[in-house]
Amino acid sequence: MATYFVGDIQGCFDELHVLLAKVDFNPSKDELWVVGDMVARGTQSLETLRYLKGLEGSVKPVLGNHDLHLMALHGKVKRVNPKDNLGALLAAPDLNQLIDWLRLQPLAREHKAHSVLMAHAGIPPQWDVKTVLKESRKVQEALARDDYIEHLIAKMYTNSVSEWSPETKGLKRLVYTINALTRMRFLHSDGRLNFDCKLPPAKGEKEGLIPWFKQPGRAMKGHTLVFGHWAALMGEVNQPGLQALDTGCCWGQYLTLWHLESNQKITQNKLKKS
């Protein structure tokens, strides 16, 4: 059995297919952990979701911000941006089934045997493993509700919830979890989430911001953290215990696969379309 973690696919299905062929991925015995943002930007979001859903128990995804945004488009609380290339997916006859499958997925997963924790954007520095999984579970339960659109999706679009407090309750707590686990890159010096800066770490630091993984005193100990979301990193964090897997395939760069057992990375360049 082999365990693979893949970075932001974002509808780059052909590249995913070639990458998995390189490692002879066998869903009957191997596992594919997906770091979120399975859809949008690339042209094959429909094929990507159908394939991942079809892997059944062999796939272990977490949700990214684009996956949650797809739910908002499906629920008609947001308008479609043509740049997202989601037309075929939104018109698919099995869209409802694909959305229902997405709604079952968490925002964070733990591989206990190897002490690995995965979330799309990263882990707030105040949270330990227990807190991450507990707060992720609350969002997962909210997404499983019949009224999940009105209860959560329609209300999650806000930058005003940027500060963690254990006393925060209800919707605000759910929104903080979504913002932290699917949108976070930089923090302000007081620990608040910054939603505007998407620059590489060195440039953001010149503006007084702190990459979330450089915040002193992080509560997470003893786990390797796997994340995507931040294409400007191009997989380079130069810090032990971190695996950054978003390498900008949908922007013309490449898709990255991390083989857990050997600690090796395999990549596939963006394919040129004929």
UniProtKB/Swiss-Prot annotation:
Keyword tags: Hydrolase
GO MF annotations in UniProt: bis(5'-nucleosyl)-tetraphosphatase (symmetrical) activity
SUPFAM superfamilies, alphabetized: Metallo-dependent phosphatases
Entry's EC annotation: 3.6.1.41
Enzyme class: hydrolase
Any Pfam family hit: Metallophos
Catalysed reactions listed for this entry: P(1),P(4)-bis(5'-adenosyl) tetraphosphate + H2O = 2 ADP + 2 H(+)
Keyword Hydrolase recorded: yes
NCBIfam families: apaH, PRK00166.1
Similarity annotation: Belongs to the Ap4A hydrolase family.
Function: Hydrolyzes diadenosine 5',5'''-P1,P4-tetraphosphate to yield ADP.
Protein name: Bis(5'-nucleosyl)-tetraphosphatase, symmetrical
Organism expressing this protein natively: Shewanella loihica (strain ATCC BAA-1088 / PV-4)
UniProt gene name: apaH
